[in-house]
Amino acid sequence: MCETYSRWLLRVSVAQICQALGWDSVQVSACDLLTDVLQRYLQGLGRGCHRYCELYGRTDPILDDVGDAFKLMGVNLHELEDYIHNIEPVTFAHQIPSFPVSKNNVLQFPQPGSKDAEERKEYIPDYMPPIVSSQEEEEEEQVPTDGGTSAEAMQVPLEEEGDMEEDEAINDENYLSKRPLESPDAEEFPPMKRPKLSVSKGDALDGALEPREPLSSINTQKVPPMLSPVHVQDSTDLAPPSPEPPMLAPIAKSQVPTPKTLESKPPAPKTKSKTSSPGQKTKSPKTTPSPVVAGSPIRSPKTGSKEKKSPGRAKSPKSPKSPKAPVHVPPPPVKPETPSRTPLAALSDKIGKENIQVKQGQTPPEPVTKPNIENQTKKLPVVDKTIDDSIDAVIARACAEREPDPFEFSSGSESEGEIFTSPKRLSVSETTATTPKPSVSTNCSNKAGATPVPPSGGTSSSDISWTMDDSIDEVIRKANMGTPSNPPANFTYFSSPSASPPTPEPLLKVYEEKTKLASSVEVKKKLKKELKTKMKKKEKQKEKDKEKSKEKNKEKEKNKEKDKDKEGNKEAKFQWKELLKDDEHDPYKFKLKDFEDADTKVKLKDGNTKKEKEKHKDKKKEKEKGKKDKDKKDKEKVKDKSKEDKIKPPSAPLVLPPKEMSLPLFSTPTAMRLPSMLPSLSPMLPEKLFEDKEKPKEKKKDKKEKKKKKEREKDKEKEKKDKEKERKEREKKEKEKEKHKHEKIKVEPVVPAPSPVIPRLTLRVGAGQDKIVISKVVPAPEAKPATPVSRPKTPPPVPSPVPAPVHVTPPPAPVPAPPQPTVSPALLPPASPAVSAAGGSKAPVRSVVTETVSTYVIRDEWGNQIWFCPGCNKPDDGSPMIGCDDCDDWYHWPCVGITAAPPEEMQWFCSKCANKKKDKKHKKRKHRAH
């Protein structure tokens, strides 16, 4: 809009200028062109003013800047001044409103004496406005946030903003969740709270990731501590981790069941979408608190109060439901014991022990649950006693009303049963796998029917190192955008309130459906995360492998190759066996297990698989190095056996690629994404193994053959390189010759036996530019006086009909065929003073005359020579030409100012050669004078 408006203003100004200069009218095209010119002119002027402003440290231009800009554009200020004085000023025809309309500054600088100004950190300069103003924070507390994918979309209360740094620290400390936090308050809280926290670490992490979904609950976080139990319950869903960083990690662990409850409570899908990206929680302090709130509803009331105290955490959306809502929420966290009823009993038994004992408040069996409880206890002490009382009341109600919700527990336990069997497995990657399932369960319990976003996104946040947070957020957001619609349809039967425990059959269905839904999205997210982590690990491994390979190269290469072949086969078999075992399970389980067991369990399986992979890589590298070394040794042998080797080569490459293929297929999760890939890969495995077993000897032969081939190729390359070097040397020589203006270089070795016959050899060098004429000469004393070099002039090309050049050439020079011009032996001895001096000795001399064929001579496709006149750079057109007796360049007569052919006896030299002759004469005279 501004551009078109400004262009119309320029158009009016152009018309006014033309009118002021006396024009009555102007063509449209001319007006458009002038408008464009004026626009560019003003833009250039403005750009120059702006640059000079910046150069001198000003924000607004002054008159000096405009003057400098005019000078930069080549405008003489004096002339401009005269022009303005001599022409009447023309005012613009219209009033121009200021555009674009200036907007008020929205930056919320704190007022002096305000809370923000007092709390402002010293290292923050005064000119930096706060990211979020206190007013905005208050509004956020009052108004529920819209669904958004970004972490900032989740509104955070004022307190949270103040504690942003604290939240970040808390997020970082999620890894510290195992560390027990001992606080006197921990024992004060009823065991019911503990059970939620005590839920297996994986559950807590899942809750932390997923709870984000209900953004509406964010408002509840700000609810005053005195809230009624109903409000407390809502806030409990939000239950944010205590402001203390250590507390956050334990809450995340216990929150796995709670996220389900939270998801069930949130009425609006928008909130779910926000919370759905679990990665965001860990990434942004704001998001993290909400997942914590999503934690178990029982402990949530206390956590809610904590959230009130800790601004960073109070993000979990509060459930729109009335106090009854906790009934649905509590079942998953409150009664992990009940899951035993469900067919998932086996899985629940593992998790159930931890969850049930912790919830009962008896003795948490696993150390992980204890630290979680302790962490929560630390968080709880922060809450006011009044809040604690209300929370206790809410908890008591929830305990009375709630029946174990097998769905929620099962959702956590399904994936967790395997993952959480040992506290070690509770590694971040495992928790990520479990989190998606709880989210699905929450979707089922949700009466609102909001489409739950697959929780799989949550897995990413904890799995990857903190540096990967940004990339993880993007991945989670993308996953959340695509997946939310599917789960609700599958879980329609779960819409009924979770107050009454469903029958075990629905649990099985839910479990299968959850695994299916979660598997696709989770697998993708896991794959992305794992790929990132693996890439880093692979780089480190490669560096280690390089160092190892260097050390190993010192050892005997032959023994290494044998051992490597055997070990490589074994490793390949082992890896493929694992893949085949995974294939036996349904594809969804296969994906989950691969990523949870092989990739996500960094502590357990990563050590074995990575070690094997590293060994495999190291072996390959060592093999390659060994091959190179052997190639060097075998080069001599290869020459003899080159014929046999040519026939054998193809076999070796066929055997090796399968080995190389096996590693990437197993190591890279991307290959696993498509289940269709698995069947195609599985048939290949036995064949590869079979080849590896039966053909160890063939492999050795193939390796030798490959080495021989490589040696042959190297020999060929060496020959090519030698040829190229020779060519380069020739080119250099030619350049030097041109620099010396085609001087003759003569080497004169003494020949013991003089021979009256003068055999002559003419050799073509390079692209026909140099002729090496070797002749045996019996020098005669007459040669001394002949200082000028008499050399046959190479005649113009045969096709030229003009006889003139032939007349120009001296009589001794025959007209030879252009491809091989010859030099008459009689002319050679006097070629240079060196030869004449040698002639005085009467010793027979073999002279090698390097005759430079002018660069102005080119051979065409048929081998014919084409002469170019150096004067005009045009080819021989049949007009008369004259050749230089020294450099053999042929010139058109007009180019050198000749109108008639000179006498044949007279030698003709071009300007270059004539100057050389003069220089030589001057040098000789100087030497003689000495």
UniProtKB/Swiss-Prot annotation:
It is found in: Nucleus. The keyword Transcription applies. Residues 540-578, 599-612, 621-648, 688-699, 712-737 have a biased composition (Basic and acidic residues). Residues 274-291, 448-462, 674-686 have a biased composition (Low complexity). Keywords: Metal-binding, Nucleus, Transcription, Transcription regulation, Zinc, Zinc-finger. A zinc finger (PHD-type) spans 866-916. Residues 793-820 have a biased composition (Pro residues). SMART domains: BTP, PHD. PANTHER family: TRANSCRIPTION INITIATION FACTOR TFIID SUBUNIT 3 (PTHR46452:SF1). This is Transcription initiation factor TFIID subunit 3.
